[in-house]
Each structure stands twice: as structure tokens, then as C-alpha cells.
């Protein structure tokens, strides 16, 4: 859903906000869609464990407006991380969001 890195190489600062002070290691950060879903290659990030939350900084408003429901994937929630607090600013999509504008027709 963050298409900018794949489309034109936009570089977003990625931080492990679950474990920000651990030793830094090199990671490739990828998504769950098979085609060109790579956010960063060989990026230095604090040690990552399953369940950690990664923050993509300086993403801006275009990230949502450029997102899609490719492969019927729900758009994730948007979360603002400010003053050590997580605030949901857009809810995660659900199945009903994918079909709400579809119209049933009888052929």
C-alpha cells in the first residue's frame, strides 16, 4: 500500500518503534504482495523481532491517495506516532469496504 518506493524510489525513514535502542542490523523490508513489494533494501534498523512495529516516517498524504486494493488487500490503518503515543488517524479497511461501491446486476 506504500507504493512510492516501488514506483519511483522514494526513501522513507524506517524505525523500529517497539525496540528503538537495540543494536542496529541491516534488513530488507518487504510487504505481503508478491510483485515489487520492497520498501527498503539493506537498511540499518534496530533489531527486529516478530510482532515489532515499524514506523515509516515522512510518508505524507500521497501515500494513502496513491494506495489501492490490489489483490483485494485491505488498506492498513494509518497511525500517527507522536510524543511516544500511537494514535489511529484512519481505520484499517474491512471486507465491507472492498465491496461497498459494487452494484449487483442481474444478467
Question: Language-model features: where?
Answer:
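Charged (often Lys/Glu-rich) extended helix/loop segments that serve as interaction or gating elements
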Residues: 1-107
